[in-house]
Regions:
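Conserved "HGTGT" condensation-loop signature of ketosynthase/thiolase-family condensing enzymes
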Residues: 1-150
């Protein structure tokens, strides 16, 4: 499933509604419920406000289902135009190999990320469905859901 939205309110700060809309559209297109997603690869603007807004959007959509959340961007840095594609590759490798990579350098959760199930160390886990976010400058928001082929 794929979801896209645009909120264009600020050049470097996606709001909460735009990212939440993209994730909901991806779930709808995939024919899945929030509880079906077992891992989220987060990717906001790497700014305190942008990351807090992504955390709020994830919590708004996934609530108490508590999928694991991490950001491979924390290990690679910003890969500019390649980021969304490489994060799909990283997430697919994790799904095929049965682990969730940690969100490195994550030490003190803010009020929004504290509500999420953030992986702060490598977790051994088999999972079949993940969502990968790409929220960027100018309010462009995309979410892709991948389900393991069986």
């Amino acid at each position: 499933g794929y979801g896209f939205s645009s909120n264009g309110g600020h050049i470097s700060t996606p709001n909460v509604d735009g990212p939440a809309t993209a994730m909901r559209k991806a779930l709808q297109q995939a024919g899945l419920n929030a509880a079906d997603v077992q891992y989220i690869n987060a990717h906001a603007t790497s700014t305190p406000v942008g990351d807090a807004n992504e955390a709020q959007a994830i919590h708004e959509v996934f609530g108490e289902t508590k999928p694991y959340v991490s950001s491979t961007k924390s290990m690679t840095g910003h890969e500019c135009w390649m980021a969304g594609a490489s994060e799909i590759i990283y997430s697919t490798i994790m799904m095929n190999e049965g682990f969730i990579a940690p969100n490195i350098n994550y030490e003190t959760p803010d009020e929004h990320s504290a509500k999420l199930n953030i992986a702060s160390k490598t977790i051994t886990k088999d999972f079949d469905v993940y969502l990968s976010n790409s929220f960027g400058f100018g309010g462009t928001n995309s979410a892709v859901i991948v389900k393991k082929y069986k």
